[in-house]
Amino acid sequence: MNNWPNPFIEQRADPFILRHLNHYYFIASVPEYDRLEIRRAATLEGLRDAEPVVVWRAPQSGPMSQLIWAPELHEIDGKWYIYFAATYTHDLDALGMFQHRMFVIECADSDPLTGRWQEKGQVETPFDTFALDATTFIHQGKRWYLWAQKSPHIEGNSNLYLAEMANPWTLKGEPVMLSKPEFDWECRGFKVNEGPAVLVHGDKLFISYSASATDENYCMGLLWIDREADPLQPENWHKAPQPVFRTSYENRQYGPGHNSFTQTPAGEDVLVYHARNYTEIEGDPLYDPNRHTRLKLVAWREDGMPDFGIPPADTL
C-alpha cells in the first residue's frame, strides 16, 4: 500500500503527472498563473522535493499573457508538448466568462527541462469561445483531443468535447460533445464540466472530469465507453448519475478534483488531484492559493469500475 504524504505538493492545483520511461514528470497551475514549470524525479515520491524548472513564462501581453491554467505535459512521437489555457485579459466577457483559449508549446529536444520550447499557437475549434483543460491520448490507433469549452448554444460554463487530431496542435473532423452539466452536483455555483482525464482498464475507457464551482462544491464525475465502441458516437458513452469523488467533511478535504492519472512502477493506477483543507475562502476561489496536490490509489471493483473512495485526511 502506498501511503503518500498528504498534501503531496502544496499550492499546486490542476496537477498532472506523466510517467515516461524511467522518470515521473509533474506540472500544475502555480498560484501566480504566470509560468509553466516541470519537476522530474525517478520516483513518484521524489517529485515532492524535485526542483521545479521554469520552461516558459507568460509574455507581458497578447493572447497567452494572463492566467495560465491547468498545463499538461505529453510526449508525442519523440517530441514534448505542453497544453495549457491562457487569455489576454483578466476581464470577463459579456456572458461573465473568462476569455481563455487553449495553446500548445513544443520541445523537439530529448530533455524537456533543458530543451528549447516553441509556441505552436492556439488549438482552433469550431467555435471561438472559452476553452480550457485539454488532454490528449491514443485510442483505437488514433490520437484524440479531449477538452472543455463553452458552447454558444448551451447554458453553462463548459461542456466536454472530443475530436481526432491531425497533429498535436490541429484538430481533424468535427468534434462531438460527450457531456454537459445536467445533474445538480454539476451545477453548484456554476454549470461546469471540465478537467477531463483518461483511464483505461479492462474492456473500458473511462473519462473522469470535474464539476461545479472551484470551492467545496467541486467534485468528480465519470464517463465510460466500451473500448471497441466508436467514441465519436455520443450514445456509446455512459455517465455516472452521482459524483465519484467529492468533499469529505469528516476528513476536512474540500473540493477534490481536476485530476490526472499515473501509475506506480507495479502498475497500480494513481489518482492525482487537488483539494483544500478549509472552506473559508475570501473572494474568488481561483485566487486562493491553497489547492494542494494529493495522491490516492484507485481501487477496482469486480465489475471493472473504478472506486475512488473518499479523499483521505491530511497527514502533514
Please tell me what each predicted stretch does:
Residues 1-316:
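Carbohydrate-active catalytic/glycan-binding domains of CAZyme proteins
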